Structure formats: C-alpha cells, structure tokens
Amino acid sequence: MRIIGRLPDPRMQITVFENDGRFPVQFELGGVTQVYRFRKGDGLQHFGHVESLVDETFRTGVMEQFHAMHRLHAAVNARLGGSAADDPHGDLPDII
C-alpha cells in the first residue's frame, strides 16, 4: 500500500492510498481513524477521481461519524471512572 496523496481539510487529516486495485481513503481526527475503501473502476481510476468523490457532503458525513465516535469514547471513559486525560501514563507501557 502506498500513499498517493493527501486532501487538504482544516478539520481532519485525509490520506489517499492505492492498494491492490483499491483506493483506501483514511480520515484521522483526535486519535480516531475512519477508512473507506473504493474499488478502481470506470469512474475511479486515479487520485483526481478520488478527490472529486471525497466532496463536502462526504466529509460532512465523516465528521458526523467522528462526533458520534468521540461521544461513545467519552461515555466509555466515564464508565471507567475517568478519562484518558486523567491517566498520567496514557497509553504508554512501563519501561524497565
């Protein structure tokens, strides 16, 4: 899998890959990732086609999903009695 480009967006990072006849498009925001995979075909052959596909309507839907994912993550952290911000060690393992 190789990166063929990035799409500018002030809200999130968008990376377009090419892999085995597909274009995976990865969206990242605040430690959460969404990946959508599209098969190459007549209307989808190169980066420019992917760029046209990932329009504002698509991006708005991705942002709505990110908001839902963050709400779920916050709810799970609340059930655990805190948040990741409360953990001084975060996700890092102890090094001896």
Report each predicted region and the residues it spans.
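Short, charged/polar N-terminal "headpieces" of proteins
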Residues: 1-26
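Residue-level marker of intrinsically disordered, low-complexity segments enriched
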Residues: 1-2, 30, 48, 52
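Residue-level preference for alpha-helix termini and adjacent loops
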Residues: 2-6, 35-37, 57
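General secondary-structure edge motif
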Residues: 5, 42, 46-49
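Polar low-complexity intrinsically disordered regions enriched in Ser/Thr and small residues
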Residues: 8-9, 46, 84-85
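A short, structured beta-strand/loop element
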Residues: 21-45
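Acidic, low-complexity intrinsically disordered segments
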Residues: 49-96
